[in-house]
């Protein structure tokens, strides 16, 4: 239990930040899931559209400190590879 005024304020700030970060993390997961569902359905156009929407969300989460920059980069890279593979198989 926080005793000093500054510790009490810090506790309040942490609680607010936690709520904001949870919302950001949830938003990122939603966008990534939409890309994965589009890939699973086999629709290359829908997958590309969903990927283009997810990419800035991942970058934003990394810049805000919700995700590590390397984690966001890795997720973008792997999603891009899967979307590209899907578009190659549908056109070939």
Curated annotation (Swiss-Prot):
Residues 1-23 are annotated as: Disordered. Keywords: Ribonucleoprotein, Ribosomal protein, RNA-binding, rRNA-binding. InterPro entries: Ribosomal_bS20, Ribosomal_bS20_sf. Coiled coil: none annotated. Pfam families: Ribosomal_S20p. One of its GO terms (cellular component) is cytosol. It comes from the Bacteria. The keyword Ribosomal protein applies. GO terms for biological process: translation. Disulfide bonds: none annotated. One of its GO terms (molecular function) is structural constituent of ribosome. Binds directly to 16S ribosomal RNA. Belongs to the bacterial ribosomal protein bS20 family. This is Small ribosomal subunit protein bS20. It comes from Rhizobium leguminosarum bv. trifolii (strain WSM2304). The gene is rpsT.
């Amino acid at each position: 239990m926080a005793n000093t005024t500054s510790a009490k304020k810090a506790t309040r700030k942490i609680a607010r930040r936690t709520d904001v970060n949870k919302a950001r993390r949830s938003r990122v997961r939603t966008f990534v899931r939409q890309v994965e569902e589009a890939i699973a359905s086999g629709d290359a156009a829908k997958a590309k559209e969903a990927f283009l929407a997810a990419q800035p969300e991942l970058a934003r989460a990394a810049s805000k400190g919700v995700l590590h920059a390397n984690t966001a980069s890795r997720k973008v890279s792997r999603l891009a590879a899967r979307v590209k593979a899907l578009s190659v198989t549908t056109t070939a």
